[in-house]
């Protein structure tokens, strides 16, 4: 690929309303899995001014204090004053949780065969490329790092006027399929009313953006749009309603790869929307790391109650050292993509999900689906 082009991805902060909802959903999931690894959880959250509504379908032997968990997450994010329009101590927490349908349960938990079927039909994508050290597209990887840096600056007191809600958008210029410079940075952060706009712009540019993005990618042509409306005091749930599962592109590949449409947060790993998407990332990353391709996108699909995938598709975008059909044969040989196989391979029945709910589900080495444990076997095919 010799053409010159630009590509844009965005990330949002842990205080973004949709991300508040994702974190509460996954914190409740973690609390349940800590007591009952076989629980069935589909937890959805809505946040708006002064209230949190927790709903969904949960079947479990565990008991968890939904209200306490919800308030703890909001406090941890940093909404600790009514002046922000949202306060962990005073907000209302409403619960509307039911049980999983027995019609779904009988297909997922086959008591005769003891085989775990897929929790629903669906299609999932996994992706990896060589453009960053974590095998992720650079725009989304660096957008997440900008948001992480902002959170650290807020919580440490480095920039005391910061408030929790924020988002950024990063446009990178590519040559020969690799990022070479930053074209545009769009950065909007909630702030206290006493900070001057020019001081905010300088602090974000110098202490956040330039401390994260590679210096060789920044030049006098780089465009910065920092709080371009001039004021962002009203934010969080006071400014916008937040819902679980509305940031699926932020959670995955920033638009660089396709998406099957299912969200992750609040779902136990019997839901292939989540677990199979993680498995697809694991497969794609190991394929690229093994040198079978410089870029790989994988699609897998499932039928409800059926263990084996109904299809596997691979695209290496002309970068493959093997035919796509040969790579699919290797996937069948080296990866168990049944729901139970995925759960066992990645030890997914653990309370590990709250940490995934911010800054992306991929590209961080502490997640088990990021392991490069199949590289040696796959590379033998070259």
Swiss-Prot record:
PROSITE patterns, A to Z: ADOMET_SYNTHASE_1, ADOMET_SYNTHASE_2
Binding site for Mg(2+): 18
Residues engaged in binding K(+): 44
Cofactors that this protein relies on: Mg(2+); K(+)
Protein EC: 2.5.1.6
Gene Ontology BP annotations: one-carbon metabolic process; S-adenosylmethionine biosynthetic process
InterPro entries in the cross-refs: ADOMET_SYNTHASE_CS, S-AdoMet_synt_C, S-AdoMet_synt_central, S-AdoMet_synt_N, S-AdoMet_synthetase, S-AdoMet_synthetase_sfam
CDD domains listed in its UniProt record: S-AdoMet_synt
Localization in the cell: Cytoplasm
Key words of the record: ATP-binding, Cytoplasm, Magnesium, Metal-binding, Nucleotide-binding, One-carbon metabolism, Potassium, Transferase
Main location: cytoplasm
Residues that coordinate or bind ATP: 16, 165-167, 231-232, 240, 246-247, 267
Superkingdom of this protein's organism: Bacteria
Keyword Disulfide bond: no
Region Flexible loop: start-end pairs: 100-110
Coiled coil: none
Residues that hold L-methionine according to the record: 57, 100, 240, 271
Pfam hit, one: S-AdoMet_synt_N
Pathway: Amino-acid biosynthesis; S-adenosyl-L-methionine biosynthesis; S-adenosyl-L-methionine from L-methionine: step 1/1
Catalysed reactions, semicolon-separated: L-methionine + ATP + H2O = S-adenosyl-L-methionine + phosphate + diphosphate
Entry GO CC: cytoplasm
Function per UniProt: Catalyzes the formation of S-adenosylmethionine (AdoMet) from methionine and ATP. The overall synthetic reaction is composed of two sequential steps, AdoMet formation and the subsequent tripolyphosphate hydrolysis which occurs prior to release of AdoMet from the enzyme.
Name listed for the protein in its UniProt record: S-adenosylmethionine synthase
Species for this entry: Legionella pneumophila (strain Corby)
């Amino acid at each position: 690929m010799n053409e010159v082009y630009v590509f844009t991805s965005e990330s949002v902060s842990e205080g973004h309303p949709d991300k508040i909802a994702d974190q509460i959903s996954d914190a409740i999931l973690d609390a349940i899995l800590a007591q009952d690894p076989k629980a069935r959880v589909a937890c959805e959250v809505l946040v708006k001014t002064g209230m949190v509504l927790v709903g969904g379908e949960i079947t479990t032997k565990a008991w968890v204090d939904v209200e306490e968990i919800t308030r703890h997450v909001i406090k941890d994010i940093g909404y600790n004053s009514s002046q922000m329009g949202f306060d962990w101590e005073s907000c209302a927490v409403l619960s509307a949780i039911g049980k999983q349908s027995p019609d779904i349960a009988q297909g997922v938990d086959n008591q005769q065969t003891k085989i775990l079927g897929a929790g629903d039909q669906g299609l999932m994508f996994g992706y990896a490329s060589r453009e960053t050290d974590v095998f992720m597209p650079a725009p989304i990887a660096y957008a997440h790092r900008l948001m992480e840096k902002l959170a650290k600056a807020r919580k440490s007191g480095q920039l005391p006027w910061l408030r929790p809600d924020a988002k950024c958008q990063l446009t990178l210029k590519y040559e020969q399929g690799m990022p070479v410079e930053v074209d545009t940075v769009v950065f909007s952060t909630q702030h206290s009313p006493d900070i001057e706009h020019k001081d905010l712009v300088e602090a974000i540019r110098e202490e956040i953006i330039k401390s994260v993005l590679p210096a060789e990618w920044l030049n006098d042509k780089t465009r910065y749009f920092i709080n371009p409306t001039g004021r962002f005091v009203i934010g969080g749930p006071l400014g916008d309603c937040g819902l679980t599962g509305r940031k699926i592109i932020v959670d995955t590949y920033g638009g660089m790869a396709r998406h099957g449409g299912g969200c992750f947060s609040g779902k136990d790993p019997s839901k292939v929307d989540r677990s199979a998407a993680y498995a697809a990332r694991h497969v794609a990353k190991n394929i690229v790391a093994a040198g079978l391709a410089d870029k790989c996108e994988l699609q897998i699909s499932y039928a409800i109650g059926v263990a084996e995938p109904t299809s596997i598709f691979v695209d290496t975008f002309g970068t493959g050292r093997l035919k796509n059909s040969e790579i699919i044969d290797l996937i069948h040989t080296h990866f168990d993509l049944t729901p139970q196989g995925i759960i066992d391979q990645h030890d997914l029945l653990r309370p590990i999900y709250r940490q995934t709910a911010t800054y992306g589900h991929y590209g961080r080495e502490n997640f088990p689906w990021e392991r490069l444990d199949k590289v040696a076997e796959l590379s033998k095919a070259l």
